[in-house]
Amino acid sequence: EEKSMKKNDIFELEITDMGTDGEGIGHYDGMTFFVKDALIGDVITARATKLKKNYGYARVEEIKTPSTFRVEPQCELHKRCGGCQIQALSYEKQLEFKNNKVRNNLMRIGGFSEAELDSKMQPPVGADNPYRYRNKAQFPVGYDRDGNIVTGFYASRSHNIIPVEDCRLGVPQNKEILDIIKEWMNECGITPYDENTHKGLVRHVLIRYGFTSKQIMVCLVINGDSLEAKRRAGNAADILCESCLLYT
């Protein structure tokens, strides 16, 4: 039987579940729809963007009735950045989502029965504060459209850099360090690595913070096999840290 639904059709959809990547799942006209940025419990106006035989994809046109699990996100970039797809979901519901994801994978891939998991699998232990807890972060370096040096994170399923000044999951010191590195690169004519041309020096900045020691390790991941290139990267140590190890 041919479906009446066509691409760009607009329809009301209740989100009743969430997929493994945090997308909302709803059912309409005998089809299952996957909707980015929709949360379980939302009632939305959706626009069909891609249709298959029994399922399709849609985007949110309007949230008609917000889910009771929907909260105000801490980061305005959560929809674009590839790391916080479910930040608009309450933390308690995030834990439930992650628990179900692990549980379903153990049954589907590991072959465990529901009874086995009921007896052996413990619920996840949540953090007292789900922000500012990550002691390690790696930031790709590149250019924005105006030719300015930027650091940030990759957009979902791409290597396009979303400029991030201060990720709420990492420590506040990251922003200051990244600002110093960008200033150093601009002043010294140091270029970011370009994945298309394979030219440029600085690929990533890795920062690790010791919550106990209060020490910070900064690693510049560079595209340079010559000692001179590495020395140019090592010059940043005068600004960034007390000591520097230069590997040749």
Go through each PLM region and give its residues.
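Accessory RNA-recognition modules of RNA-modification enzymes
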Residues: 2-246
